[in-house]
């Protein structure tokens, strides 16, 4: 079974979020995800596949995708390159059960894949049962969701990669809408909106942002090398 097939099965079986409110959450029915999905699909550009004189497949416009601001997301949306993008992030996280929900919700919410995965690296190093105890609350799971902010989630919810990824990426979407750029959005994710907009961002948060952005830069470079090895623009 391919990763893409498992992704479809995973999504079909997701009836999870908001468990404590009574009704099951079905992601396909979420109006926010539906609107986002309609918006981003209209922007898709096709990867061009050609055959050279020796019968080798080449991808002459693959570098156009890699030069874009969110190359991994753009290539995830292309049928030709999608499976290889999935393979890359499954290898990165070490688990389909971790990578596939992040890919799914980042796509639906139009969030950069490299930003999303870098955030999870910074928060939990891709450990779905990671726990951090604060003085008055607990952070849990992949996106380290806070027990005070997400009071409606059960302990099982926090440690469920699908549930955690949805809530973490929805909160990141909010942070991106409030911040001036991705760096400020990460600061809001870590320290909260009030402290950041008041100019009271803690030094620890600034280090946190630098660490995640540094990891992301390395991730982008590695991803680009991987894609070029899988989809050569020309045959050397």
Predicted segment positions?
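N-terminal secretory targeting signals
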Residues: 1-89, 220-236
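Catalytic glycan-binding domains that act on GlcNAc-containing polysaccharides
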Residues: 61-236
């Amino acid at each position: 079974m391919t990763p893409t097939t498992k992704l479809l099965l995973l999504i079909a079986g997701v009836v999870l979020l908001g468990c404590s409110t009574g009704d099951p959450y079905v992601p396909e029915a979420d109006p926010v995800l539906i609107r986002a999905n309609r918006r981003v699909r209209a922007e898709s550009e096709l990867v061009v596949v050609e055959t050279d004189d020796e019968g080798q497949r080449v991808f002459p416009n693959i570098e156009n995708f890699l030069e874009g601001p969110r190359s991994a997301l753009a290539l995830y949306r292309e049928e030709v390159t999608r499976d290889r993008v999935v393979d890359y992030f499954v290898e990165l996280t070490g688990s389909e059960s971790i990578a596939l929900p992040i890919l799914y919700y980042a796509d639906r919410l139009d969030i950069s894949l490299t930003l999303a995965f870098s955030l999870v690296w910074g928060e939990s190093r891709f450990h779905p049962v990671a726990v951090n105890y604060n003085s008055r609350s607990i952070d849990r799971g992949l996106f380290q969701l806070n027990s005070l902010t997400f009071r409606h989630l059960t302990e099982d919810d926090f440690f469920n990669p699908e549930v955690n990824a949805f809530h973490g990426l929805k909160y990141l979407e909010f942070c991106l809408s409030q911040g001036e750029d991705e760096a400020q959005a990460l600061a809001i994710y870590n320290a909260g909106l009030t402290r950041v907009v008041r100019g009271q961002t803690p030094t620890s948060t600034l280090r946190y942002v630098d660490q995640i952005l540094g990891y992301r830069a390395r991730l982008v470079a590695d991803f680009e090398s991987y894609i070029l090895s899988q989809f050569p623009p020309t045959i050397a």
